[in-house]
C-alpha cells in the first residue's frame, strides 16, 4: 500500500462536490492532476498518512460568530425561521431580522479573550495529535484574511486572522494542521434570510437578506425549485469552486 505524503496544511473539506461534478462541462474547473483518480480501484492504492493512522485524538475548533448568541451552529439560519426558538430569541435580544439579522451579529464577535498559543499548549497536553480549524461555516463568513469578500474575521468582528493564528500555534507545538470548509451548502442554507414572517405585524416584510447590499453574505435569491443541500445554481457552484 502506498502512503500519501502529508502536506503541512491539509484541507479537510466538510462539503463534497458530488452535485458539481455531474455538471463539470458547464464550468471552468481547472483541477490539477493528482496521485489518483476518482474511481474505487484507484483509491484502493492509497491509504491515510502514517501519522494520521496513529493519531487517535485530534481537536477541531468549530468556532466563529456563532459563539455570540451561544445557541448552536445553525443560529444564522434559524433566526430567519419564525417557528424556531432561535427566531424568538433573536427578536428579544437584537430585534426583528428585517433590520437586525446575521450581518449584525458578526461585528459583535470580538474574541477578546482568545489566546490560540495557550489553548494549543493545553490541547497538546490533553493528548491531541493534530488540530483542525474551521475555515468557514454555512454562514459564508471566512475566518481567515480573505481577499474574496468583506465578510471575514480580519475586516470584521475580532479583526484577526483566526485560521492563520491557529496554524502558527499548531506549528509551534508540532501538531499537523488542517482546515475544514462548509461552504458547499451555503447558498440554499441561507435562503430563509430572503423570506419574511408569515404571521404577525411584520408579515411579508422582507428579512435583511432580501437587501441586495448584503448578497455578498446571504447570496442572491435562489430559484424556488432549488432547495437541495447543494444548490443547482451554476454561478454559485463556480464561485464555490473558485473559493475553495
Give the ranges of each region predicted by the language model.
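N-terminal phosphate-binding caps/lids of nucleotide- and nucleic-acid-binding domains
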Residues: 20
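Bacterial N-terminal signal peptides that target proteins for export
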Residues: 1-9
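Mature catalytic domains of secreted/periplasmic carbohydrate-active enzymes
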Residues: 23-244
Amino acid at each position: 500500500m502506498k502512503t500519501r505524503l502529508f502536506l503541512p496544511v491539509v484541507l479537510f473539506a466538510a462539503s463534497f462536490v458530488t452535485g458539481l461534478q455531474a455538471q463539470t462541462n458547464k464550468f471552468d474547473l481547472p483541477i490539477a492532476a493528482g496521485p489518483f483518480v476518482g474511481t474505487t480501484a484507484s483509491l484502493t492504492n492509497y491509504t491515510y498518512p502514517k501519522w494520521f493512522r496513529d493519531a487517535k485524538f485530534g481537536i477541531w475548533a468549530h468556532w466563529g460568530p456563532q459563539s455570540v448568541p451561544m445557541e448552536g451552529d445553525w443560529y444564522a439560519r434559524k433566526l430567519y425561521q419564525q417557528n424556531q426558538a432561535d427566531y424568538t430569541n433573536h427578536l428579544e435580544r437584537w430585534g426583528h431580522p428585517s433590520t437586525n439579522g446575521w450581518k449584525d451579529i458578526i461585528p459583535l464577535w470580538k474574541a477578546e479573550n482568545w489566546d490560540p498559543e495557550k489553548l494549543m499548549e493545553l490541547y497538546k497536553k490533553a493528548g491531541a495529535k493534530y488540530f483542525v480549524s474551521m475555515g468557514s461555516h454555512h454562514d459564508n463568513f471566512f475566518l481567515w484574511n480573505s481577499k474574496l469578500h468583506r465578510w471575514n474575521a480580519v475586516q470584521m468582528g475580532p479583526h484577526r486572522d483566526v485560521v492563520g493564528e491557529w496554524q502558527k500555534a499548531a506549528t509551534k507545538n508540532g501538531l499537523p494542521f488542517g482546515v475544514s470548509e462548509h461552504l458547499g451548502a451555503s447558498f440554499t442554507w441561507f435562503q430563509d434570510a430572503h423570506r419574511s414572517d408569515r404571521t404577525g405585524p411584520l408579515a411579508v416584510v422582507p428579512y435583511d437578506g432580501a437587501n441586495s447590499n448584503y448578497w455578498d453574505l446571504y447570496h442572491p435569491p435562489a430559484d424556488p425549485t432549488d432547495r437541495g443541500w447543494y444548490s443547482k445554481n451554476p454561478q454559485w457552484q463556480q464561485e464555490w469552486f473558485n473559493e475553495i
